[in-house]
Regions:
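Mixed-charge (Asp/Glu-Lys/Arg
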Residues: 1-153
Length: 153
């Protein structure tokens, strides 16, 4: 429980892509998992790391569909291209998953976007990631308790 509270505090302090870029790949995957849970996904399984076969997270939506999630913590200007998107789609096929979500701290190239549209892969770029992080912070139990504390002062 203490670990969860510390995690919530760390998330509450994140304000920019710079704060996300200093996370380790595993921490970035864990943050993405929390964002997915806050947006209605359940049974979020973080499988990233070496040997993850190109899938970092599996998560189920409210309709019971399994989603494969790829997380790429790229520096600004390091665009996700179509070869990376093709590899992700290949791994979705390998794992027999129909729905994909690709999350990056940077942006996607036009060919990668076109491929994602063809393959029904949802894209979350750095700007959208910050918006989702802000929503997660607003819905956090820690944030609620901080608001109560502020009102009492």
């Amino acid at each position: 429980q203490e670990k969860e509270r510390q995690e919530q505090e760390r998330i509450a302090r994140m304000k920019s892509l710079g704060d996300i870029l200093v996370l380790t790949p595993k921490e970035f995957e864990e943050l993405t998992g929390k964002i997915l849970e806050a947006n209605g996904f359940h049974d979020v399984q973080i499988v990233g790391g070496s040997g993850d076969l190109g899938i970092d997270i599996f998560a189920w939506d409210q309709f019971g569909y399994k989603h494969a999630v790829q997380c790429k913590r790229y520096a600004p200007g390091n665009t996700v291209g179509s070869p990376t998107m093709q590899t992700f789609f290949g791994m979705m096929f390998h794992h027999q998953v129909q729905k994909g979500i690709f999350v990056t701290t940077s942006t996607f190239s036009r060919p990668a976007i076109d491929l994602a549209i063809q393959r029904d892969i949802q894209l979350i770029d750095g700007n959208q990631l910050i918006e989702l992080l802000e929503r997660l912070q607003q819905s956090s139990p820690l944030n609620s308790s901080l608001k109560i504390a502020d009102k009492n002062q």
